[in-house]
Amino acid sequence: MPLLNSLATPYAEALLQVTEARGESQTVADQCKQLLEIWDSSADFRNAMVSPVLEPDAKKMALQALVGEQVTPSMLNLLKVLADRQRLLAFDAVMLRYLELYREQQGITLAEVRSAQTLTEDQQAALSKKVQAMAGTNMVDIDLSVDPSLIGGFVVSLGSQVIDASLAGQVRRLGLALAKAS
């Protein structure tokens, strides 16, 4: 992904500069997350946007129709520039890089949380408080994902620190302890 990162960085930096000047960087960060969810969940949309068969103007019209009313003009302009320059292949890299630069600028720590099942609102709130305490700051952005292979519990990645409170992790550690003992 280094090549995509080097391609994505100028676009992400430009978007951050524009949104910072307009006071909408938080709004655009939220929009990046929403657009990434759409991008990841719809293979048809993704395939159409990266297809060399579709003309840039058709892609821009589709983007305008799909998200034009729900995103800031800055975000819409970026999407149109990516379409014009045939760079929609790097769409997710641009969004992720923007989020990374935004967090860095705002002093926000990213916590990646994988749970065995979807968490309720109350569980998310409790987990958020615990992660904030672990990070030592209230400025924590939590990226939740579901990983059924964990069997139960969750795994929190906070920078280089990993807290494995999953059933699969406990079974693995028990197996290692038994192997060591014999």
From Swiss-Prot:
Q: Name the SUPFAM superfamilies for this protein.
A: N-terminal domain of the delta subunit of the F1F0-ATP synthase
**Compartments in which it is found:** Cellular thylakoid membrane
Q: Which domain of life is it from?
A: Bacteria
Q: Which UniProt keywords apply?
A: ATP synthesis, CF(1), Hydrogen ion transport, Ion transport, Membrane, Thylakoid, Transport
Instruction: Spell out the Pfam families in the cross-references.
Output: OSCP
Q: Which GO terms describe its molecular function?
A: proton-transporting ATP synthase activity, rotational mechanism
Any GO CC annotation of this UniProt entry: plasma membrane-derived thylakoid membrane
Give yes or no: UniProt keyword Acetylation: no
The primary location reported for this protein is: membrane
Q: Does the keyword Mitochondrion apply?
A: no
Family, per the entry? Belongs to the ATPase delta chain family.
The record ties this protein, via HAMAP family, to: ATP_synth_delta_bact (MF_01416)
Q: What does this protein do?
A: F(1)F(0) ATP synthase produces ATP from ADP in the presence of a proton or sodium gradient. F-type ATPases consist of two structural domains, F(1) containing the extramembraneous catalytic core and F(0) containing the membrane proton channel, linked together by a central stalk and a peripheral stalk. During catalysis, ATP synthesis in the catalytic domain of F(1) is coupled via a rotary mechanism of the central stalk subunits to proton translocation. This protein is part of the stalk that links CF(0) to CF(1). It either transmits conformational changes from CF(0) to CF(1) or is implicated in proton conduction.
Oligomeric state and interaction partners are given as:
F-type ATPases have 2 components, F(1) - the catalytic core - and F(0) - the membrane proton channel. F(1) has five subunits: alpha(3), beta(3), gamma(1), delta(1), epsilon(1). CF(0) has four main subunits: a(1), b(1), b'(1) and c(10-14). The alpha and beta chains form an alternating ring which encloses part of the gamma chain. F(1) is attached to F(0) by a central stalk formed by the gamma and epsilon chains, while a peripheral stalk is formed by the delta, b and b' chains.
Q: What is this protein called?
A: ATP synthase subunit delta
What organism is the protein native to?
Answer: Parasynechococcus marenigrum (strain WH8102)
